[in-house]
Curated annotation (Swiss-Prot):
SMART domains, A to Z: ANK (SM00248)
Modified residues (Phosphoserine): 175, 186, 431, 561, 659, 1054, 1214, 1350-1351, 1405, 1442
Domain of life, source organism: Eukaryota
ANK repeat start-end pairs: 27-54, 55-84, 88-117
Gene3D superfamilies: Ankyrin repeat-containing domain (1.25.40.20), Transferase(Phosphotransferase) domain 1 (1.10.510.10)
Keywords tagged on the record: ANK repeat, ATP-binding, Cell cycle, Cell division, Centromere, Chromosome, Cytoplasm, Kinetochore, Mitosis, Nucleotide-binding, Phosphoprotein, Repeat
Organism per entry: Rattus norvegicus (Rat)
Role according to the record: Required both for the formation of intercellular bridges during meiosis and for kinetochore-microtubule attachment during mitosis. Intercellular bridges are evolutionarily conserved structures that connect differentiating germ cells and are required for spermatogenesis and male fertility. Acts by promoting the conversion of midbodies into intercellular bridges via its interaction with CEP55: interaction with CEP55 inhibits the interaction between CEP55 and PDCD6IP/ALIX and TSG101, blocking cell abscission and leading to transform midbodies into intercellular bridges.
Region (Disordered) residue spans: 547-614, 635-654, 852-886, 902-922, 1253-1273, 1318-1410
Family the UniProt entry places it in: Belongs to the protein kinase superfamily.
GO terms classed as biological process: attachment of spindle microtubules to kinetochore; cell division; cellular response to leukemia inhibitory factor; intercellular bridge organization; male meiotic nuclear division; mitotic sister chromatid separation; mitotic spindle assembly checkpoint signaling; negative regulation of cytokinesis
UniProt note: domains: The protein kinase domain is predicted to be catalytically inactive. The GPPX3Y motif mediates interaction with CEP55.
Annotated protein name in UniProt: Inactive serine/threonine-protein kinase TEX14
Length: 1443
């Protein structure tokens, strides 16, 4: 006896045992020891070679797992099954793969082993081989790959001589996957000599692990049973028919395709799987069905025609004969509308075919186990086939049953399965009888067994001891069959399939005999009525046969007879009903024959069917057919002795038909009402139609009783026609029932859609309500009035331009680096009017002053963004002289005026709110200017305690959505799109704004969009300023640039600033932004109020400024009177406070530039040190303007730059030339090559120096009193300056003087150089220290400033005439009026200047020195500053620098 080999570790399975002393136990014991001699002796005694142990393992499995080569040879020679399934689903092929021995695996494969099978965990033999370890798995996996490659080569049609050279897997042992030659020899090969070719496969049967196959005489590769093996490309979709698929059980799907010009149905697995999925084992079901179907042949079994293999050989598809209708389950429960009536003859015929197929399977030793209505396939009308053999078991001689897959029955089939199958006990022939009885009950009651209960619940119910009983509604003899067949215990199922088939055949014979004879002496024959065509009851699919049923029904309507009836007058009677009996209606005859339900009762049942009644409609209709025939016999017995004659028959028919016609008309009206309701549902769901029910509706609408046929010799039976009419009524009622069920389903779907719509409407209402509540929260808030011209008296003129022309290029507006949506937002929103919603919140709309200021381009501007003046274009690299600048300015202004005329006219047409003529507007304007000037010189103007920031605060609070920020640069602006989209959605929801258009007609927008656009536009410089104002917080400051910051429009020194910042941050800033504000505030002290606020603001068009700064209700105007900013807008007097410029706007009809900054000269003395300081600040501003291209409006930029070049110098005689050259500088700045977008244009140092130096400039450009107060205010806050800083200041002055001299003489490149950046960084320190020593020289500075300003009166007045001349080009008449008005104002002011004296300077300085921060909040504070004194108004600065 051979020595036992140790069990390989790790092993995926355990080995079972047998403890008795039987031969099977000895077989397994010797198999474990590897003693093939003793095994051979035991097998000779007749022991089953596939006897299993406690784990379902055969001796071959044990030998292959332990690696006994000789023992495997013996067991295979004795016929052991290589695909035997253990209880865990594994096979000897799995065991051989795990052993690592190629010879053992080759022997198992040669015997028919399959490499595609899976165990219960979804593992195939290759997975078992990999589990054995790398040292043993490498050669084994390569061997399996060679077998697969060889099989592929054979399928793809390579030379079949290859099969003669390599006819078994043994010849692939140790061979590379090369098929021209053969390299033999392997350490794992068999000790025996290799067999010669042809010895193993003498019968041309081959197996390489993918099923047994052989070559026919025509060299066709086939499986046993002559099943062709085809490729997946050979099965295609037919061109002349639609795709038709249906489910054949829980896992399989059937599809109608074409193979080799034959119409077939292909079965495949329809279950998504993934690698290492346990559901991969379900693929074994197709292999098992292929095995069974290829070995079984019967007319009632679905014929397997071919096997389709995939390219990777892993998936197979089974090619069956064409199935036209589908499964019985789909006909009964899924597509019943296509088959409304199943007659008894059809039902019996189908049941007989299924019984024949089951009898054949049982005779071959197979048990179907999974018989259900899914397994019954109706291939054509009246022809059924049994399939789904994948769960079939084979009973052997020893009484054991062989399951090829070990896949448990799916729970979906428990409704038909026998209790022993559900509980996974041993299945027998009685199990199939139980399932067949379930099908009989299902087809007669239209109910799924167990009333459609879920399979898992069915199993629980059976486990608890509950079982089904036969339905009492079943007719005889089917009730007896079902009652006997569904007993819980198998021994009580006394009726076998032969007995059931005998009963069914007898019933069918009686039915057929009744069709042929139809005699009154045969009550059993009268139980059935012959149907006109079997296709009417069970037609084909809707694609193929729709016309034959229609034809038959029409034929039935027209003739009133059965088309396929043997005779039209088969009833030969001499007795007819009495006339009085014929007069009664069908409903009155109901008590006489309770078996025949009346038409009215049937209609009532259709209207309100119960679940139990609905399942029996098919059976009841068939009973009605037979019952109607027995009605005649019963009546004959009731009325004996009634005479009969042809004339009597005719008279009786004439009397009977009207009463029947009344009943039919009543049903027809009811069905018409139903059809009308049904049409309304077809409007909702257009996909649904009554294709199969159209002919029934037609028959109802055109139902008319034909004239009784006149047949010779009086052989026509009156009841035959009555039966026909009743049968048609019953058919129509059944159709109506189905249609009503469909309509109920459509109604349910419609109600669901309506509910969804209502829910969506509720959500929308809730959102609108929340937004409305948010807007009403600030509805009663009292806002401060806007500072500006009196809106009660001023109305802008309506200007009609003579040359409307579409602008070709919009170079007048600076284009920011913003997203397209923001660009449109700014262009549309900032030229918009107020909406009604905001008007309700005390926001008073203000009409735009000048339509010319709306001159933005209506077409997309593809030009680079420029900093042009009004119409100013790039005039070259050199700075021209004064005269050339004037000529160039006039030419370019004319060009741009012509461009803007068409836009202005269109905007005027769409946005102007009044139609007053220009003359009346100018007269009102002139009166308003004079009134304001009188109040100013008399000291009657009132000043609010602080700036109008609080009004904007309230307005920010009114907004329900956060204001988006303008984009910064690079990746920092990535979330701009999301913010903008959110803003768009909210705006569109509230009806405030309409995005997506840039035409001039879209200018009429609301106030909300104007405010939003202004916030976006005015918040562009602040991040740069904050980023570099505090170098040690560079990183945090840079992060703050990504946030959307709502900017303050005016600077304030009031105590409410902190509160306002917090409120505004809650709307527009993240938390990090607020924290950083306070960090900077802690470092810089109180001065951080100025440092952390935006010091400059992008200049916008006059309309934006007019809307945002001049919002004031009439009531507030009366209460608050007029403030100083009104005077600034009207007469160019700058109202400045706390070292900050304001965003102001010019309201004159003919000017588009912003109001100019002004100063008040005192005495014409020589230039002093104060002028020098003023000059330094202007030079700093010049440097910054030369180096940065912030977002200034074209016109504003020209005036800003031109006036910033105005420097108070000792050489007063060269002032005019200096100013003329400086006015041409903007042309240099507008060069597209040198212009930078906002996002990356300016360096941090330039931005810092620009803000800081201009802050100093603003303080020094104030009137003397304001400068003194401001400087004194900051002296207390700033630390004393260091000596080294003072030295640097003196050095900077000298450098700036030299740089200004070079600028006066030559026009050089205005790009910022590294030297300029260095100067600007140093100047930041200089400007921060100016306020510290300004107070010590304050009195002298004020006197010098007065003398400097007086000396330049005439020159600056000439400079001011340039904008007037430019605007005159738009309208010469109006331009002269404006010029005259300006001169008149100057004359009035000069006279008042002479009449009234200037108060002593001591009083002003004292008032400044004595002013506290709390006093600034009082309205009388500004009167104490000297603003009530008469002043001479001239212009030094036309820039509109704002926050």
């Amino acid at each position: 006896m051979s020595r036992a080999v140790h069990f390989p570790v790790p092993c995926p399975v355990l080995l079972g045992t047998l403890t008795d002393d039987s031969l099977e136990a000895q077989l397994h014991e010797y198999a474990k020891q590897g003693n093939y001699v003793k095994v051979k002796k035991i097998l000779k005694k007749g022991v089953c070679v596939d006897a299993v142990n406690t784990l379902g393992q055969s001796a071959l499995f044990v030998a292959a797992l332990l690696g006994y080569v000789k023992l495997v040879d013996v067991l295979v020679d004795y016929g052991s099954d290589p695909n035997h399934r253990c209880f865990d689903g594994s096979t000897p092929v799995h065991a051989a793969a795990f052993s690592g021995n190629q010879w053992i695996l080759s022997k198992v494969l040669t015997a028919g082993g399959d490499l595609r099978l899976h165990d219960e965990k979804g593992r195939n033999p290759q997975a078992w081989a990999l589990a054995a370890g790398k040292d043993r798995s490498t050669q084994m996996v390569e061997f399996m790959q060679r077998c697969a490659s060889h099989m592929k080569a054979v399928i793809q049609g390579f030379s079949y001589d290859l099969l003669k050279k390599i006819d078994s897997p043994q010849r692939l042992i140790g061979s590379p996957p090369w098929f021209g030659g053969l390299i033999q020899g392997s350490p794992n090969s068999s000790p025996n000599r290799q067999p010669k070719p042809g010895i193993i496969s003498a019968q041309n049967i081959y197996s390489f692990g993918f099923g047994k196959f052989y070559l026919t005489s025509g060299m066709q590769l086939t499986y046993p049973g002559s099943l062709p093996v085809i490729g997946e490309k050979e099965v295609i979709q037919a061109d002349d028919e639609p795709t038709f698929s249906f489910f054949s059980g829980p896992y399989m799907v059937m599809t109608n395709l074409v193979w080799n010009r034959s119409r077939v149905t292909v079965k495949e697995l329809n279950l998504p799987t993934h690698p290492h999925c346990s559901r991969l084992r379900l693929a074994d079901l197709l292999i098992a069905e292929q095995e069974h179907s290829s070995n079984l042949r019967h007319p009632s079994l679905l014929q397997l025609m071919a096997v389709c293999l995939s390219r990777d050989l892993e998936k197979i598809r089974l090619v069956y004969e064409r199935i036209t209708v589908g499964t019985l389950f789909s006909v009964l429960h899924e597509r019943r509308s296509q088959f409304p009536v199943l007659h008894m003859e059809m039902i019996v015929h189908l049941l007989l075919q299924i019984a024949d197929a089951l009898i054949y399977l049982h005779s071959r030793g197979f048990i179907h186990r999974s018989l259900s209505s899914y397994a019954v396939h109706i291939v054509s009308a009246g022809e059924a086939r049994l399939t789904n053999l994948e769960y079939m078991m084979e009973s052997q001689d020893s009484g054991a049953h062989r399951d090829m897959t070990r896949v448990p029955l799916p729970a979906q089939l428990y409704n038909w399965a026998a209790p022993e199958v559900v509980l996974q006990k041993t299945a027998t022939v009685k199990s199939d009888i139980y399932s067949f009885s379930m099908i009989i009950q299902e087809i007669l009651t239209d109910n799924i067994p167990w009333n459609g209960l879920d399979g898992s619940l069915v199993k629980e119910t059976i486990a608890l001891g509950n079982y089904l009983e036969a339905d009492v509604r079943l007719p005889e003899p089917y009730y007896d069959i079902v009652k006997s067949g569904i007993h819980a215990k198998q021994k009580n199922r006394t009726m076998n399939l032969q007995d059931i088939r005998y009963i069914l055949k007898n019933d069918l014979k009686e039915f057929i005999g009744a069709q042929k004879t139809q005699t009154t002496e045969s009550p059993r024959g009268q139980r059935y009525e012959p149907h006109p065509d079997i296709n009417i009851c069970l037609g084909l699919t809707s694609e193929y046969q729709k016309d034959p049923p229609d034809l038959d029904i029409k034929e039935l309507k027209e003739t009133g007879s059965q088309p396929h009836s043997p005779t039209d007058h088969s009833f030969l009677t001499e007795k007819t009903l009495a006339p009085q009996t014929l007069d009664s209606s069908l409903s009155a005859q109901e008590p006489d024959n309770p078996n025949v339900p009346s038409a009215s009762r049937l209609a009532e049942e259709v209207r309100s069917p119960t679940p139990s009644e609905a399942s029996l409609y098919s059976f009841e209709i068939n009973e009605i057919y037979s019952g109607c025939l027995t009605l005649g016999t019963d009546k004959e017995e009731e009325c004996p002795g009634t005479a009969s004659s042809p004339e009597g028959d005719k008279a009786n028919q004439v009397d009977e038909l009207p009463s029947l016609e009344e009943e039919l008309d009543k049903m027809e009206r009811e069905l018409h009402c139903f059809c009308e309701e049904d049409k309304s549902f077809s409007d909702v769901d257009t996909d649904l139609s009554f294709e199969d029910g159209d002919w029934q509706s037609d028959s109802l609408s055109s139902l008319s009783l034909p004239e009784p046929t006149r047949e010779a010799k009086g052989k026509t039976s009156s009841w035959s026609k009555t039966d026909e009419y009743v049968s048609k009524c019953v058919l129509n009622l059944k159709i109506s029932q189905v249609m009503m069920q469909q309509s109920a389903e459509w109604l349910r779907k419609l109600e669901q859609e309506v509910d969804e719509l209502e829910w969506a409407q509720k959500e929308l209402d809730n959102q609108c309500r929340s937004l409305w509540d948010a807007s009403l929260r600030f509805a009663n808030t009292k806002f401060l009035s806007a500072v500006g011209p009196p809106s009660l008296t001023y109305l802008p003129p309506v200007m009609q331009l003579s040359e409307p022309k579409q602008p070709e290029n919009g170079g007048n507006w600076l284009t920011l680096a913003r997203p397209p949506g923001n660009e449109r937002d700014f262009q549309e929103g900032n030229f918009s009017k107020k909406s009604e919603k905001l008007s309700a919140c005390d926001w008073n709309p203000f009409t735009q002053a000048s339509e010319e200021s709306r001159g933005y381009c209506s077409e997309p501007n593809n030009q680079p963004p420029t900093l042009c003046g009004p119409g100013k274009q790039n005039t070259g690299e050199q700075l021209p002289s004064t005269e050339e600048a004037k000529e160039s300015l006039e030419r370019n202004t004319n060009q741009n005026i012509r461009r803007m005329e068409s836009v202005s006219s269109e905007v005027c047409d769409t946005k102007s709110r009044n139609n007053e003529d220009a003359g009346e507007a100018r007269s009102k304007w002139r009166l308003a200017v004079k009134e304001m000037a009188e109040k100013a010189v008399s000291g009657q103007l009132l000043v609010p305690p602080w700036n109008l920031q609080s009004s904007f605060e309230s307005k920010v609070e009114n907004e329900s959505t956060p204001l988006p920020r303008p984009p910064i640069r690079g990746p920092e602006s990535t979330d701009w799109q999301y913010i903008l989209e959110y803003q768009r959605e909210k705006d569109e929801l509230k009806g405030n704004m309409k995005f997506g258009k840039m035409e001039n007609s879209d200018c009429d927008k609301n106030k909300h969009s104007s405010w939003t656009g202004l916030q976006r536009f005015t918040s562009i410089i602040y991040p740069f300023f904050r980023n570099h104002e505090q170098p040690e917080h560079n990183e945090a400051s840079q992060a703050s640039c990504d946030t959307x910051c709502g900017e303050k429009f005016y600077s304030t020194s009031s105590p409410i600033e902190d509160d306002f910042e917090r409120i505004q941050s809650s709307f527009a800033q993240p938390q990090g932004y607020v924290e950083e504000n306070f960090q900077i505030r802690e470092i810089f002290g109180k001065n951080a109020e100025i440092l952390t606020k935006p010091q400059f603001q992008a200049v916008q068009c006059a309309e934006d400024e007019q809307e945002e700064t001049l919002e004031e209700t009439p009531k507030e105007l009366k209460e608050k009177n007029i403030s100083l900013t009104d005077i600034q807008d009207l007469s160019s007097i700058t109202y400045e406070q706390d070292g900050c410029f304001k965003e102001t706007s010019c309201k004159t009809p003919k000017l588009k530039h912003a109001p100019t900054s002004a100063s008040t000269p005192l005495s014409p003395e020589s230039i002093s040190s104060a002028a020098s300081h003023y000059e330094d600040c202007l030079e700093n501003t010049f440097h910054v303007k030369r180096g940065s291209t912030f977002c200034w409006n074209g016109q504003e930029a020209m005036r800003t730059l031109s006036t910033k070049f105005t420097t108070v110098r000792e050489r007063a005689k060269s002032l005019e030339s200096l100013l003329a050259s400086s006015k041409t500088l903007p042309a240099k700045l507008t060069d597209p090559k040198r212009l930078c977008m906002f996002g990356g244009a300016c360096s941090s140092n330039i931005s810092t120096a620009f803000v800081t130096s201009t802050h100093s400039t603003k303080r020094k450009s104030l009137p003397g009193e304001l400068a003194e107060a401001t400087s004194q205010h900051h002296i207390d806050e700033l630390p004393p300056p260091a000596q080294e800083l003072l030295d640097e200041i003196e050095q900077l002055k000298q450098q700036q003087v030299s740089s200004m001299v070079s600028l006066e003489n030559t026009a050089h490149d205005l790009n910022v150089t590294e030297n300029d950046k260095k100067h600007l960084e140093e100047q930041e320190t200089n400007s921060s220290k100016d306020s510290s020593f300004l107070s010590s020289r304050e009195i002298q500075d004020l006197e010098d400033t007065e003398r400097a300003h007086s000396s330049l009166d005439e020159d600056l007045e000439r400079l001011l005439q340039l904008p007037e001349e430019n605007m005159t080009l738009l309208d010469p008449t109006k331009g002269s009026t404006r010029e005259k008005k300006t001169k008149d104002q100057d004359m009035v002011e000069q006279k008042r200047k002479k009449k009234e004296g200037i108060k002593p300077e001591r009083r002003k300085s004292d008032s400044f020195l004595g002013t506290l921060e709390e006093d600034e909040l009082k309205p009388c504070f500004w009167k104490r500053l000297g603003w009530s004194e008469p002043s001479r108004i001239i212009v030094l600065d036309q820039s509109d620098l704002s926050d």
